[in-house]
From Swiss-Prot:
General vesicular transport factor required for intercisternal transport in the Golgi stack; it is required for transcytotic fusion and/or subsequent binding of the vesicles to the target membrane. May well act as a vesicular anchor by interacting with the target membrane and holding the vesicular and target membranes in proximity. This is General vesicular transport factor p115. Keywords: Acetylation, Coiled coil, Cytoplasm, ER-Golgi transport, Golgi apparatus, Membrane, Phosphoprotein, Protein transport, Repeat, Transport. One of its GO terms (cellular component) is ER to Golgi transport vesicle membrane. Residues 934-955 have a biased composition (Acidic residues). Phosphorylated in a cell cycle-specific manner; phosphorylated in interphase but not in mitotic cells. Dephosphorylated protein associates with the Golgi membrane; phosphorylation promotes dissociation. Pfam families: Arm_vescicular (PF18770), Uso1_p115_C (PF04871), Uso1_p115_head (PF04869). Its main location: cytoplasm. Residues 764-782 have a biased composition (Polar residues). It comes from Bos taurus (Bovine). Belongs to the VDP/USO1/EDE1 family.
């Protein structure tokens, strides 16, 4: 306040002094008047003066205005005037600054008044509570005032809102306001609120902000919408950028799928307004936020897959190949597609299949490379195409092979009708444009990145330089152009290509050294004292020569490792060589290129280093320095140690693979045993069901037997005499047929039981075979279950035998009944009995016989079903027994293999112990010779011992199993 009063006191007297008195009177009226109308009029007058006399109103009226907000909440009009006045005091409008021509000291009034306002945190809480009012004259000024506070002192206001109860939730309600002015200003408020505050970003996201913002964008027409769409997209970027939690929530909420309609740009003639270009640019940037290389790899990969599955990548490729797209949108689309496919094999394969709508159709990669090597294309577009090509080849050995194959003689189109990617890269590599040379060299280096196979394949490429001359290899042509002294950008690109090509590829090093002019050229370049511009080239030449030493397999006697180091010491000097090598990492553009993969340069002359190449320099600089200072004896000892360790590693790897295979076999056997257990449980359940069914059949049979006994006792001679009506003989004949069928079924059942007996005997013999004691616990459990199953089958057999005996008794009783029937058929009817009584008895007997026949049929059907189920059980037992026998044989073989493996592992441990002793003696010799033993060697030997211990433990566990 003293500062503000000092500013006010420094102003000239005159009319302003009169206005100051007026403001003082108005403030007194606001503070002392008891009538609401008087206070309202006074606040309205302060509002009208607040823009022109911002300082005076702010100093004298701020406390009174805050008091009005606290005491007069019931009157929306005075609250609105007070909020507008505070907004005019705190905000810094550009027009206001132009009108006032204020000094730098007065330009800071907004932040000063903001600091006074938020000094009491209750003022911000009061403002948040006022935003709950639905009245337009209260809510809208409140939104503008809070937005201005956030713009002035964002972090402080954010912290107050964060600790305020339901503070963020109240602000989220603004997005649901039906009045567009409040909703749109609410979006601006949330922009300022979420800027650089991860905690608030998470709260806003979980308050359903994504859903509401996407709804607003859809309602406004997606990319064809107005500035509201732009504001929503900026807010979405604030919520998602560098916020892994919100990115995962956005993906899990299936919001990526809702982004696809954004890129449906429509017809070519629909036009591209400035707002549409801005909106689409922000939409593309939002996609890039989700798949940025700076995100965790897992999150980026999941978003890339989701974009392919929902068709978003396909839609982006459609824009990429469309005509009439503005240059900046096309450039940003290329960058977006680049990061969507980077490191994702599925997306990279799809991009390789995209064709441009030309006649004949050409792959999109070829069309993009044509733009990259065309010097008439914009620089930014060429950088974007290079980035797209790099992302296509990133961790994509399949794509690298396809690009290199277009350079090989067998795949080149002899007719010349089509242009391949390899031809375009070669054309750019040897063109007169230095930028095309650099881009083509870097692109070709990415085709060789971490791919030794393609490095060897590229050695086969032959170039026809001129008519009548023999073809020259691509490697030789690169060195020829390098020695011709072209532009620095061209030489840097070629040196980066050669360094990438020769690293980790001894065959390529041999081909490079085979040309006798290469080594003298490199040593000459390094030894010269050139200007600062040539120091980078000298450093790259030193790196290339160091790679030729470090990855040299000594296959050429002329350029063995030791001879090359002697050559460096004589012509250059080791210290000078290391100093020149350090020029690379000390270059000002090196650190800039190492920060991010995208080649983003302000102008072509800054295009010197590639991101992946900086990783290679960081990896090789130290090892090359050590290799230069090592003596020949140390090299020999190191090579011997390396060979020994490689042999040990191969042996250990072999046994690890063997143990891994045995573990897999054990897992398979365990799975098979568990499957057999399940099958046995199912069989046991089936047997239990069969036992219950047999019991039911037995009960039905007993009931039928009782009923037949009652019929034979109670019907007497009347039933026998009723056989003369002509109906009973037919039923009796049918009953005889049914009995015959029962006999045949019984015989069939007995034969099946005999087969089951033989099966049980086979099972017993298999269980008594040698080697039973060596079976695993899981197999023993199966044997117990099979034994239980045998007992159940034996019980089933006894029950079926008893049923057969009972059926035989039933047949005997039926025969007796038939005999009685035939005997009475010959006798005459009893005299004195009427025909009506005889007919009634006959009908009763017929009904009883019909019921008997029906029950007999049901019994027959149930016996048939039982027979079929027994057959199925037999088949399942057969398959189970055969499987158990096979498993037993395999387990015996596996135990023999495990025993052999344990013996081999013991031999290996002895061998490793001997080698450890040799390594220890070598270290002692080195110490005696005065050479320090490096810590890395000790760590490596320690790691080797740990691996040996782990292998020994694994072997013990395997033997125990």
């Amino acid at each position: 306040m003293n500062f503000l009063r000092g500013v006010m006191g420094g102003q000239s007297a005159g009319p302003q002094h009169t206005e100051a008195e007026t403001i003082q009177k108005l403030c007194d009226r606001v503070a002392s008047s008891t009538l609401l109308d008087d206070r309202r009029n006074a606040v309205r007058a302060l509002k009208s003066l607040s823009k022109k006399y911002r300082l005076e109103v702010g100093i004298q009226a701020m406390e009174h205005l805050i008091h009005v907000l606290q005491t007069d909440r019931s009157d929306s009009e005075i609250i609105g005037y007070a909020l507008d006045t505070l907004y005019n005091i705190i905000s810094n409008d550009e027009e206001e600054e132009v009108e006032e021509n204020s000094t730098r000291q007065s330009e800071d009034l907004g932040s000063q008044f903001t600091e006074i306002f938020i000094k009491q945190q209750e003022n911000v809480t009061l403002l948040l509570s006022l935003l709950e009012e639905f009245d337009f004259h209260v809510r809208w000024p409140g939104v503008k005032l809070l937005t201005s506070l956030l713009k002035q002192l964002g972090p402080q206001v954010q912290q107050i809102i964060l600790v305020s109860p339901m503070g963020v939730s109240r602000l989220m309600d603004l997005l649901a306001d039906s009045r567009e002015v409040i909703r749109n200003d609410g979006v601006l408020l949330l922009q300022a609120l979420t800027r650089s505050n991860g905690a608030i970003q998470k709260i806003v996201a979980f308050e359903n902000a994504f859903e509401r913002l996407l709804d607003i964008i859809t309602e406004e027409g997606n990319s064809d919408g107005g500035i509201v769409v732009e504001d929503c997209l900026i807010l979405l970027q604030n919520l998602l950028k560098n916020n892994n939690s919100n990115q995962n929530f956005f993906k899990e909420g299936s919001y990526i799928q809702r982004m696809k309609p954004w890129f449906e740009v429509g017809d070519e003639n629909s036009g591209w307004s400035a707002q549409k270009v801005t909106n689409l640019h922000l939409m593309l940037q939002l996609v890039r936020v989700l798949v940025s290389p700076n995100n965790p790899p897992g999150a980026t990969s999941s978003c890339q897959k989701a974009m392919f599955q929902c068709g978003l990548l396909q839609q982006l490729c459609t824009i990429l190949m469309a005509t009439g797209v503005p240059a900046d949108i096309l450039t940003e689309t290329i960058n977006t597609v680049s990061e969507v496919i980077r490191g994702c094999q599925v997306n990279q394969d799809y991009f390789a299949s995209v064709n441009a709508p030309s006649n004949p159709p050409r792959p999109a990669i070829v069309v993009l490379l044509m733009s990259m090597v065309n010097e008439r294309q914009p620089f930014v577009l060429r950088c974007a195409v290079l980035y797209c090509f790099q992302c296509f080849l990133y961790k994509n050995q399949k794509g690298q092979g396809e690009i290199v194959s277009t350079l090989l003689p067998s795949t080149i189109d002899a007719t010349g009708n089509t242009v391949s990617a390899g031809q375009l890269l070669c054309g750019g590599l040897f063109s007169t444009d230095s930028l095309s040379n650099w881009c083509a060299a870097v692109a070709l280096a990415h085709a060789l990145q971490e791919n030794a196979t393609q490095k060897e394949q590229l050695l086969r490429v032959q170039l026809a330089t001129s008519i009548g001359n023999p073809p020259v290899s691509l490697l030789q042509q690169c060195t020829n152009i390098l020695s011709q002294g072209s532009k620095i950008q061209t030489r840097v690109g070629l040196l980066m290509l050669l360094c990438t090509w020769l690293s980790n590829c001894p065959i390529a090093v041999t081909h490079f050294l085979h040309n006798s002019a290469n080594v003298p050229f490199l040593t000459g370049q390094i030894a010269e004292n050139l200007g600062e511009e040539e120091q980078l080239v000298q450093g790259l030449c030193a790196l290339l020569l160091g790679i030729s030493i470090y990855f040299n397999d000594n296959s050429l006697e002329t350029y063995m490792k030791e001879k090359l180091k002697q050559l460096i010491e004589k012509r250059i000097g080791k210290e000078n060589f290391i100093e020149k090598l350090g020029f690379i990492s000390k270059h000002e553009l090196y650190s800039r290129a190492s920060q991010k993969p995208q080649p983003n340069f302000p102008s072509p002359e800054y295009m010197i280093f590639d991101h992946e190449f900086t990783k290679l320099v960081k990896e090789l600089e130290g090892v090359i320095t050590k290799a230069i200072y090592k003596s020949s004896e140390e090299d020999k000892k190191e090579e011997e140690v390396k060979k020994t360790l490689e042999q040990h590693d191969s042996i250990v790897t072999h046994y690890k693979n063997m143990i891994r295979e045995q573990d897999l076999q054990l897992e398979e056997l365990k799975q098979q045993i568990s499957t057999l257990k399940c099958q046995n449980e199912q069989l046991q359940t089936a047997v239990t069901q069969q036992v219950s069914q047999i019991q039911q059949h037995k009960d039905q049979y007993n009931l039928l037997k009782v009923q037949l006994g009652k019929d034979s006792q109670h019907q007497g001679p009347y039933t026998d005499g009723a056989q003369m009506n002509g109906v009973q003989p037919e039923e009796i004949s049918r009953l005889r047929e049914e009995i015959e069928e029962l006999k045949s079924n019984r015989e069939l059942l007995q034969s099946q039981l005999a087969e089951k007996d033989s099966l049980i005997e086979n099972l017993k013999s298999s269980q008594l075979s040698p080697g039973t004691n060596e079976q695993s616990s899981a197999t023993a459990g199966d044997s117990e279950q099979i034994a239980e199953l045998k007992q159940e089958l034996a019980t089933l057999k006894s029950q079926l035998n008893s049923q057969s005996v009972e059926i035989t008794k039933l047949q005997t009783e039926k025969q007796e009944l038939l005999q009685k029937t035939e005997a009475f058929a010959k006798s005459a009817p009893v005299p004195g009995e009427s025909e009506t009584v005889i007919a009634t008895k006959t009908t009763d007997v017929e009904g009883r016989l019909s019921a008997l026949l029906q029950e007999t049929k049901e019994l027959k059907n149930e016996i048939k079903a039982l027979s079929e189920e027994r057959t199925a059980i037999k088949e399942q037992l057969d398959s189970s027994n055969s499987t158990i026998a096979i498993l037993q044989n395999e387990k015996n073989k596996l135990e023999v293999d495990i025993t052999d493996s344990k013996k081999e592992q013991d031999d290996l441990l002895v061998l490793l112990a001997d080698q450890d002793q040799k390594i220890f003696s070598l270290k002692n010799k080195l110490k005696e010779l005065g050479h320090p033993v490096e810590e890395e060697d000790e760590l490596e030997s320690g790691d080797q011992d740990d691996e040996d211990d782990e292998d020994e433990d694994d072997g013990k566990e395997q033997g125990h199993i």
